[in-house]
């Protein structure tokens, strides 16, 4: 597709008859499948039945999507109150990661209780998978030309030594923008590597998951400052508030669980 004189990628991957299939959905689905593969592989190594994470994904993904959408809609209610039919339209994006995370965690807690499996064990195994899904999922935002930062020049983007397809896709309505999707994606990919390395450190159970929350939240806090489409509550950027909250809560949980003996078991214990 061409916009002005700048070639750009089409957000529609293919058409199945009259129905368009968007890259956004394909990319999100790819992230889920790769994350599932990673979690299932590690789960088997630690004695978790192979179908455990398959079952969990079947419950958690739909609930996470619903919660991600509900979270987004709640903070954009003034618009959706006037356009209620758009509430169910997610083809253009509009899924908030923090909302999805809340839904996934709630589902995981309930699932772990029903199956009588340690939630913290499941959460630790799933942590790199969740972050991998987020890293891949940001490229869905790239295809939709959303979740970008403020205005920049083409020279600025070329100075980052980005490939032309990224530079061109950041040209929206006659203006170039910060590729904040890329900053967050790279930060998340680095976090996946960190979490995979920390598996070998045999941390106390639950601490790998808290490390994920802390790592992602640090990156998200700074990236959010560049974005132009932040969900707001008065003068506050909701994602930054959530990021600070998750960092503080994670640190408190680590300290309290260690002091109270709730974190005696280690990651590699079966």
UniProtKB/Swiss-Prot annotation:
Protein's membrane topology? Multi-pass membrane protein
Give me the residues that bind a 1,2-diacyl-sn-glycero-3-phospho-(1'-sn-glycerol), please: 138
Q: Does the keyword Cytoplasm apply?
A: no
Whether Endoplasmic reticulum counts among this entry's keywords is: no
Keywords of this entry: Cell membrane, Membrane, Transferase, Transmembrane, Transmembrane helix
Q: In which pathway does it act?
A: Protein modification; lipoprotein biosynthesis (diacylglyceryl transfer)
- Enzyme class per UniProt: transferase
The family database entries (InterPro entries) matched by this protein are listed as: Lgt (IPR001640)
Give an example GO biological process.
lipoprotein biosynthetic process
Compartments reported by the entry: Cell membrane
Q: Describe the family membership recorded for this protein in Swiss-Prot or TrEMBL.
A: Belongs to the Lgt family.
| Free-text function comment from the UniProt entry | Catalyzes the transfer of the diacylglyceryl group from phosphatidylglycerol to the sulfhydryl group of the N-terminal cysteine of a prolipoprotein, the first step in the formation of mature lipoproteins.
User: What is the name of this protein?
Assistant: Phosphatidylglycerol--prolipoprotein diacylglyceryl transferase
The source organism is Bacillus cytotoxicus (strain DSM 22905 / CIP 110041 / 391-98 / NVH 391-98)
